[in-house]
Structure formats: C-alpha cells, structure tokens
UniProtKB/Swiss-Prot annotation:
Protein family: Belongs to the ATPase protein 8 family.
Tree of life domain: Eukaryota
Keywords assigned: Acetylation, ATP synthesis, CF(0), Hydrogen ion transport, Ion transport, Membrane, Mitochondrion, Transmembrane, Transmembrane helix, Transport
PTM sites of type N6-succinyllysine: 55
Membrane topology, record value: Single-pass membrane protein
Species assigned in the record: Osphranter robustus (Wallaroo)
InterPro entries in alphabetical order: ATP8_mammal (IPR039017), ATP8_metazoa (IPR001421)
Name this polypeptide is given: ATP synthase F(0) complex subunit 8
Positions of transmembrane segments: 8-24
Cellular compartments annotated: Mitochondrion membrane
Cited function: Subunit 8, of the mitochondrial membrane ATP synthase complex (F(1)F(0) ATP synthase or Complex V) that produces ATP from ADP in the presence of a proton gradient across the membrane which is generated by electron transport complexes of the respiratory chain. ATP synthase complex consist of a soluble F(1) head domain - the catalytic core - and a membrane F(1) domain - the membrane proton channel. These two domains are linked by a central stalk rotating inside the F(1) region and a stationary peripheral stalk.
Example GO BP: proton motive force-driven ATP synthesis
Location, primary (coarse class): mitochondrion
Length: 69
C-alpha cells in the first residue's frame, strides 16, 4: 500500500488561508465603501408659477354605469 505524500499540504493550507484572508479583506473594504452615506446636494426648485397652479380646478369623474344583476 503506497504511503500518502503530505509534503505539499503545508503549502496548500498556507495558500488557502492567504487566499481566504485576501477575499475577506476585499469584501470588508467593499462594505465600508458602500456604507458611507452620500452627501445631499441642494436642489433648487424653479420659482416660476404657472397660471393653472394658482387656480382651483375640480375634476369630475364619469358616472358609473348601473350594476346589472
């Protein structure tokens, strides 16, 4: 029965831990970048008043048709 060669296990495990650390760090950097709240920009509304904005208008809905049973 052949003997199991374990000489590369240390290198494999070390590289796996290093890769997982790099992935974890990149995810943490992305999460901190996203959580920064965006700064509000001041929105300037136009001050022109249109003629129909000052008048009150009533909107009439059409009569509903009688229900047939």
């Amino acid at each position: 029965m052949p003997q199991l060669d374990t000489s590369t296990w240390l290198l494999t495990i070390t590289l796996m831990i290093l890769a997982l650390f790099c992935i974890y760090q990149s995810k943490m950097i992305n999460q901190t970048m996203i959580s920064i709240p965006p700064q509000d920009k001041k929105v300037i509304k136009p001050t022109t008043q249109l003629p129909w904005e000052s008048k009150w208008t009533k909107i009439y809905l059409p009569h509903s048709s009688p229900l047939l049973s």
